[in-house]
Amino acid sequence: MNQHPNKPIFKVGIGYDVHKFDNTCYNDANTFITICGIKINYHKKIIAHSDGDVGLHALTDAILGAVGCGSIGQHFPNTDNTWKNIKSDYFLIEAQKKAQEKGYSISNADITIICEQPKIMPHALEMQEYIANLICIDPSCINVKATTTEKLGFLGRKEGIAAQAIVLCCLQN
């Protein structure tokens, strides 16, 4: 039974993020990008104000949108040096706190990473577990998958990486 008759029981949010790759080709074995909290070896770096984790940025944006709290750019603007090089875990945890303050918990999330390279699926399970642990929900409630743009556009030319996320938030009792 809904104890808050003016609040919807379910809220859905959609998030999207994109970052450009640095054109420099790095041969260092320690070169990596971070996607959904997991470091993946890759010969290019992401150009970003924070750590450039498109997966966590999209999920953060989805959560904020679901509970009517604006966007990641409003809360953590790339014009503020407070957020320079910060790990995106912080953004996600703060978004979850804002959802809880509004009386909502995260029920489940689905994240799609869009890129030609690096290959995401070998890391998807680890990403799901990482996110679930970060926001304290069952790993079965997080899904990470990947797709390409069939070599079309800037993503197809391997100039960047994108992510979209959808989240279901439920009213807490």
Swiss-Prot record:
Broad EC category: lyase
Positions of 4-CDP-2-C-methyl-D-erythritol 2-phosphate binding: 17-19, 49-50, 76-80, 147-150, 154, 157
The protein's name: 2-C-methyl-D-erythritol 2,4-cyclodiphosphate synthase
Protein purpose: Involved in the biosynthesis of isopentenyl diphosphate (IPP) and dimethylallyl diphosphate (DMAPP), two major building blocks of isoprenoid compounds. Catalyzes the conversion of 4-diphosphocytidyl-2-C-methyl-D-erythritol 2-phosphate (CDP-ME2P) to 2-C-methyl-D-erythritol 2,4-cyclodiphosphate (ME-CPP) with a corresponding release of cytidine 5-monophosphate (CMP).
Superkingdom of the organism of origin: Bacteria
Quaternary structure, from the entry: Homotrimer.
Cofactors, names only: a divalent metal cation
Keywords tagged on the record: Isoprene biosynthesis, Lyase, Metal-binding
Family to which the UniProt record says this protein belongs: Belongs to the IspF family.
Name of the coding gene: ispF
CDD domains xref list: MECDP_synthase
Organism, as annotated: Ehrlichia chaffeensis (strain ATCC CRL-10679 / Arkansas)
